[in-house]
Amino acid sequence: MYFGKTRQSDQSGRVPPNQNVTTSFPVLHTGDVPYYEDMTKWNLQVYGLVDHPMLLSFEDVKAFPRYESKNDIHCVTGWSRLDNVWQGVRACDIAEKAGVKEEAGYVILHAEEGWTTNLPLDDFLAETSLLAYAHNGEPLTPEHGFPLRGVFPHLYFWKSAKWLRGIQFTKENHPGFWERNGYHMRGDPWQNQRFTWD
């Protein structure tokens, strides 16, 4: 499934349990890869329990302060990729601009084709949480989420939704696509939270 892998024991505690390091960047998703020929037709909706709902163009997103984060990512299928450098907007900056209401406790990320995933609000607001439009200094490719994807490196990588179209703040925790199909509601790789029963 992927190449250039090494054993986790070589990585001095940087790799969670039952993971192997790869130097490639595997592409995993359901459905078709969307291609945007006209970016004026793309937008990001920020809504739910917020004081200021927003409908952001790609240029609006890029007008937020640019943030760079270097981190490791861990896929629930068993691979880890180290030293990724992402550029984008801090998730907390989006939340601050929208004015998240006190009763909000969770976030639902909406992507193309109706795909969703859920996050506790604290995970969305974490210092390392990013809405990325570039990886290692280059714009995201369509296969890796162009124009915008979530990056939540402290959780399994399925939580880092590709092809983002909406950020919804909610009071209750609603399971997303993979969570409805048996994946863990939070997905902490260091706790090996892969499936509902973990």
Curated annotation (Swiss-Prot):
Which EC number(s) are documented for this chain? 1.-.-.-
Q: Where does Mo-molybdopterin bind?
A: 75, 144, 149
Q: Which cofactor does it need?
A: Mo-molybdopterin
Ranges annotated as biased composition (Polar residues): 9-23
- Please tell me whether the keyword Oxidoreductase is annotated for this protein: yes
Task: State the residue spans of region: Disordered.
Answer: 1-23
- Pfam families the UniProt entry points to: Oxidored_molyb
What EC class is this?
Answer: oxidoreductase
> InterPro entries in the record, alphabetically?
OxRdtase_Mopterin-bd_dom (IPR000572), OxRdtase_Mopterin-bd_sf (IPR036374)
Q: Name a GO molecular-function annotation.
A: oxidoreductase activity
Query: What keywords are assigned to this protein?
Result: Metal-binding, Molybdenum, Oxidoreductase
Binding note for cofactor = Binds 1 Mo-molybdopterin (Mo-MPT) cofactor per subunit.
Task: Return the protein name.
Answer: Uncharacterized oxidoreductase YuiH
Q: What is the lineage of its organism?
A: Bacteria, Bacillati, Bacillota, Bacilli, Bacillales
Give the encoding gene's name. yuiH
